Amino acid sequence: MSPAQSAEYYEQNGRWAAVLNFRDGVQASSDERSRGGLVTEFLTGTLSPMDFARQIDLQDYAGFNLIIGDAAQAVIVNNRGHAPTPLYSGLYVISNGQPEDSWFKTEWLRGRLRQEVLPLIAEDSSPAYWQAAAFNILSDSTKAPEDKLPMTGVAFEVEQMLSSVYIEPVAFGDTKTSKPTYGTRTQSILTLRKERDMGANYTADIVSREFDSH
């Protein structure tokens, strides 16, 4: 499902969703269901975020973190021991481990958001005022020092490659070519805003940048 389609679903019914793979060194099996299907099922369904999270057959999927929400509630769940949990107002930075994990990239991103983006939003919440700063942060390729790398069951070189907010294009895996096969492909900012003159109505805006070098 494209970012534009996701924004359209929010405009229609106030629903949004994102899924991340859970990195623990366990290879996905061919008979497991697509994790991306969880996003489509929620966006096109009618269950509340919490009810949807509770009815997922967790064992049917490879490891994932799923964040789903509507205008009233947001919930995170994974199939690595994290039960469906409401997300209340605040700043959340989630990567490919447990939601509460403090990886270098999540704390680096959190710090830059607090210092460079949140002050801009406080001045003027219109997306055009602060989105450029946010995209600049999402493009940060600073890698973690060796002593701050998480241990997720992959090789050291891979762990370091994955440790930055923006993952630079690289030839990854068993490949005969030097052409990049892995890296950050899309950066998206979804903004949900309550309109003062429209009662309880919200508007959704999504802006994405695509990278086609791999």
Sequence positions of predicted segments:
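N-terminal nucleophile
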Residues: 1-214
